Amino acid sequence: RMRRLPPVSTRGRSSAASDVDKRLIFAFSSASSVGTLPINLSCTEKLGAKKEVASFVLPLGATINMDGTAIYQCVATIFLATCCGMTLTLGQMVTIVVTATLASIGTAGTPGAGMIMLAMVLQAMNIPVDMIMIIYGVDRLFDMGRTCLNITGDISCALCVTKWESKKTAQTAK
């Protein structure tokens, strides 16, 4: 039987959802994790994160926490390898995951930066970089979704760190 986890945020679900909606709409339309930072900071604080934690975690997350980009690069690389007629082994797929994860850490939080890193992952896997043109036309739509996933991870991290810090402070006080 699974144990039910306590809520990370102390606010009601409807008000928390409206705050998240604002930042997700802005992130989706701008496709920029860095551009979303001001809205993200204020909304994350409204959700219950400490200002000090949010001010540290969110800019760091906007720089290196690119979950959506890592997932996209893996899926796009496997898709483009299949389009080339390549059959990937398990070892090659693991290499793609590791390379895409490392590349996503170095990706800038600006629109379109993931495509540049995707070219690097394709080259590392000996897939013709020209194949990137197959997905280039729809990448902007994917970029919007990736940004929403990236900032959701940043928000979750800030709320979890606040919760853990509060628990640690309470344990230290005893």
Task: Give each language-model segment a name.
Residues 74-174:
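Transmembrane alpha-helical segments and their short flanking loops
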Residues 23-73, 98-115, 141-157:
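Alpha-helical membrane segments and immediately flanking helix-loop junctions
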Residues 14, 60, 135-138:
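Hydrophobic core positions of alpha-helical segments in small-molecule transporters
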Residues 5-21:
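Short, small-residue-biased leader/transition segments that mark boundaries at the very start
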Residues 7-10, 27, 44, 83, ...:
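Short, flexible active-site loop motifs that bind/organize anionic cofactors or intermediates
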